[in-house]
Design a protein with these regions (language model features):
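C-terminal binding/interaction regions
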Residues: 2-21, 69-144
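Stable alpha-helical structural segments in soluble proteins, enriched in small hydrophobic residues
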Residues: 12-15, 56, 60
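Active-site segments that bind and position negatively charged phosphate/pyrophosphate groups
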Residues: 24
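Short beta-strand scaffold segments in enzyme catalytic cores
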Residues: 27-34
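Structural signal for short hydrophobic segments within the conserved structured cores
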Residues: 40-43, 115
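Compact, glycine-rich, soluble single-domain proteins
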Residues: 44-58
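Alpha-helix C-terminal capping segments
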Residues: 62-69
């Protein structure tokens, strides 16, 4: 399935005004296309206790998993930055748990600048369930 970049960007643009970023003043929206074709958006939600803040990409992954949509197939990240902003390291790790290394990740600015990478290029040698070497494997996923 080819990513529906137009719908992904529309979903992220619709979500961006709902970002809660009073501390960084750096709102971020993400839209993820899942294996079943569903597109789910997320926004960053900051907290006065900074480590408890939630990134837009992780919010979208969590909503997609809760909705039973299956593996990640494409990711779009939208900001009002001058340069396209790819996912942070923590989000890259979460995306690697739910998507394959060939998943396209597109960073877009409100002004239309874009950068695109494959998830595996953003996080080579990701820590994955197989990294546990068979100890404590995750339970089977009936949904996927």
């Amino acid at each position: 399935m080819e990513p529906d970049w137009s719908s992904l960007e529309s979903a992220a643009r619709a979500a961006l005004p709902r970002a809660y970023a009073p501390y960084s003043r750096f709102p971020v929206a993400s839209a993820i296309q899942f294996a079943d074709g569903a597109i789910v958006a997320g926004v960053n939600v900051e907290n006065a206790s900074y480590p408890l803040s939630l990134c837009a990409e992780r919010a979208a992954v969590a909503a997609g998993v809760a909705g039973g949509h299956g593996p990640v197939r494409a990711v779009l990240v939208l900001t009002d930055a001058v340069e396209p902003t790819p996912p942070c390291g923590g989000c890259r790790q979460v995306l690697a748990e739910h998507g394959a290394p060939d998943v396209p990740v597109r960073a877009v600015t409100l002004q239309g600048r874009t950068a695109e990478h494959r998830l595996g290029a953003l996080l080579p040698d990701a820590f994955r369930p197989a990294s546990l070497d068979g100890r404590n494997p995750p339970p089977p996923r009936d949904v996927w």
